[in-house]
């Protein structure tokens, strides 16, 4: 190997070593916190997950809306059915309390076919 090739190889190795491995002056980026228990996420893939979500009577359910706007309209309104979540909700989480046992089906009026349910024990 010529002297020129060795110098070039050493330079490349030093440059590569300088590019990786460190966290930089700002430290490492921590992972996002896990979603709270009893959360229904409205995904960018136009699905509610998990589906169904099973909870105990009296528990809160958090509907987490990401960057894509969604809403929640319950299919069977009634005294025990929580209030709908109207509008175009994005980057926000909204809670509803389920006080009576049963299956509560809901859908997004913005995205036809996007539906989910909460089963209350």
Q: What is the role of each PLM region?
A:
Residues 1-18:
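Sec-dependent bacterial lipoprotein signal peptides
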Residues 2, 19-121:
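Extracytoplasmic copper-binding redox domains, predominantly the cupredoxin/blue-copper superfamily
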């Amino acid at each position: 190997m010529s002297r020129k090739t060795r110098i070039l190889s050493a330079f490349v190795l030093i440059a590569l070593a300088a590019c990786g491995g460190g966290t930089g002056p700002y430290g490492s980026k921590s992972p996002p916190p896990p979603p709270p228990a009893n959360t229904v996420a409205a995904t960018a893939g136009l699905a509610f997950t998990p589906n169904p979500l099973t909870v105990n009577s009296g528990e809160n359910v958090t509907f987490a809306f990401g960057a894509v706007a969604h809403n929640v309209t319950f299919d069977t309104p009634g005294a025990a059915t929580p209030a709908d979540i109207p509008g175009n909700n994005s980057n926000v989480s909204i809670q509803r309390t389920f006080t009576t046992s049963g299956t509560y089906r809901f859908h997004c009026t913005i995205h036809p076919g996007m539906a989910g349910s909460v089963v209350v024990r």
